[in-house]
Amino acid sequence: MASLRIEVISLFPEMFSAISEYGITSRAVKQGLLQLTCWNPRDYTTDRHHTVDDRPFGGGPGMVMKIKPLEDALVQARQAAGDAAKVIYLSPQGRQLNQSAVRELAQEEAIILIAGRYEGIDERFIDAHVDEEWSIGDYVLSGGELPAMVLIDAVTRLLPGALGHVDSAEEDSFTDGLLDCPHYTRPEVYADQRVPDVLLSGNHAHIRRWRLQQSLGRTYERRADLLESRSLSGEEKKLLAEYIRERDDS
């Protein structure tokens, strides 16, 4: 059975229990689909204070993570993952992660994630060892651990056998370049709000058409930029035009 090996270099490895002990990612670990190991740079320091950071050259606020503890942790991670493992640094300067990139990463056999802290890590480590830099958005976080967990969760969902239903990953938002359609469950009526009749009809062709139309409409209203980079089929153009017309008439 194929599996993905992910090695994480982090000053806070305990945070990754959220991945290994809960939800879909935990199930993937238990099934052997995902192998997750954390390496703490503090374990590779030689001074009694386990120093992993120092003041930046040129002055300025904050601290910068030192090269040597990171390199020594990376050596161990490479021994575990193999020399072919892609090294990724979670960084606000990186390319923004999207579903297309997640699909590519899910094809890898092994990934090493670097979760930085403080003002970042010494640029010489990045130049020497990092293959790719990825960001999860244009906002500031305290470290790379949460972005690393986001990446791990997103990639794990695409591993064969990780989800309970074979179609679940294919029907997620962004998988086909569109936002997801609305979903409903019991009861049929709640606070005078009814489930759309088409979903109760049992007509699978009509249900598919309604869901596609809702996905197109939501994307048009909330993330029109996604439609600009997507070529719509004739059916999709018709459904979107109907959605806009019905919305404007209501």
From Swiss-Prot:
**The organism sits in which domain of life?**
Bacteria
> What are the cysteine partners in each disulfide bond?
none
Question: For this protein, what is any one GO molecular function term?
Answer: tRNA (guanine(37)-N1)-methyltransferase activity
- Gene Ontology CC terms, in alphabetical order: cytosol
Q: Which residues bind S-adenosyl-L-methionine per the record?
A: G116, I136, G137, D138, Y139, V140, L141
Which catalysed reactions does the entry list for this protein?
guanosine(37) in tRNA + S-adenosyl-L-methionine = N(1)-methylguanosine(37) in tRNA + S-adenosyl-L-homocysteine + H(+)
Q: Which SUPFAM superfamilies match?
A: alpha/beta knot (SSF75217)
Indicate the principal place this protein occupies in or around the cell. cytoplasm
Enzyme Commission (EC) number: 2.1.1.228
Keyword set for this entry?
Cytoplasm, Methyltransferase, S-adenosyl-L-methionine, Transferase, tRNA processing
The secretion signal range is none
Q: In Gene Ontology terms, what is a biological process of this protein?
A: tRNA N1-guanine methylation
Q: Which Pfam families match?
A: tRNA_m1G_MT
Q: Which compartments does it reside in?
A: Cytoplasm
Task performed by this protein:
Specifically methylates guanosine-37 in various tRNAs.
Q: Which family does it belong to?
A: Belongs to the RNA methyltransferase TrmD family.
Subunit relationships: Homodimer.
What protein name applies here?
Answer: tRNA (guanine-N(1)-)-methyltransferase
